[in-house]
From Swiss-Prot:
GO terms for cellular component: cytoplasm. It is found in: Cytoplasm. It comes from Rhizobium johnstonii (strain DSM 114642 / LMG 32736 / 3841) (Rhizobium leguminosarum bv. viciae). GO terms for biological process: urea catabolic process. This is Urease accessory protein UreG. Its main location: cytoplasm. SUPFAM superfamilies: P-loop containing nucleoside triphosphate hydrolases (SSF52540).
Length: 203
């Protein structure tokens, strides 16, 4: 499902500390041998996430672009996605054979969504550490993303979160939309997310 503008564009959103950069790293490493992959990261005042991905050796540095959004990070992925679209256009010129571009948003609240002009598929990441009630609080990221990732499941016993409750609430809030529990530190759940992208993205 490459878009009219080139590669499949996958938006990765979620609150600060939920594990967006860790997910982006794992997806790059899982897919880079089979696909031509690039990343655009969004930070308010720095390019910290882009620099982190380079340090993690997720991809070569020419395939990672960091944009500084200023102000509210959700504006750059929703109301005015120009800065991200320009970054993707630059990657397309530099790497004409791109198959997939991951767009990692700046950390934001549960109301953040990607403009359909920017992302073909959206993944929303939440953390077990934010509390077991997060799935039932709803918001566009929880209810309307193409895939919900409930990360840091390994920490549930330490923060008093019941994964069965989170599973039940996510099922209810998302109706038929898929979700997956993950532990990015160990790579648990990554293969399911890659399979989802291959199937839904037509890769």
């Amino acid at each position: 499902m490459k878009s009219r503008n080139g590669p499949l564009r996958v938006g990765i959103g979620g609150p600060v500390g939920s594990g967006k950069t860790a997910l982006t790293e794992k997806l790059c490493k899982a897919m880079r041998d089979d696909y031509s992959v690039a990343v655009v990261t969004n930070d308010i005042y720095t390019t910290e996430d882009a620099e982190a991905l380079v340090r993690m050796q997720a991809l070569t540095s020419d395939r990672i672009v960091g944009v500084e959004t200023g102000g509210c990070p959700h504006t750059a992925i929703r109301e005015d996605a120009t800065i991200n679209l320009q970054a993707i256009a630059g990657l397309n010129r530099r790497i004409p054979d791109l198959d997939v571009v991951f767009i990692e948003s700046g950390g934001d609240n549960l109301a953040a969504t990607f403009s359909p002009d920017l992302a073909d598929i959206t993944i929303y990441v939440i953390s077990v550490c934010q509390g077991e009630e997060i799935p039932r609080k709803g918001g566009p990221g929880i209810t309307r993303s193409d895939l919900l990732v409930i990360n840091k499941k390994d920490l549930a016993p330490y923060v008093g979160a019941d994964l069965e409750v989170m599973d039940r609430d996510a099922t209810r809030m998302r109706a038929s939309r898929p979700f997956v529990f993950s532990d990015m530190k160990r790579g648990d759940g990554v293969s399911s997310i890659v399979s989802f992208l291959r199937e839904q993205g037509g890769l």
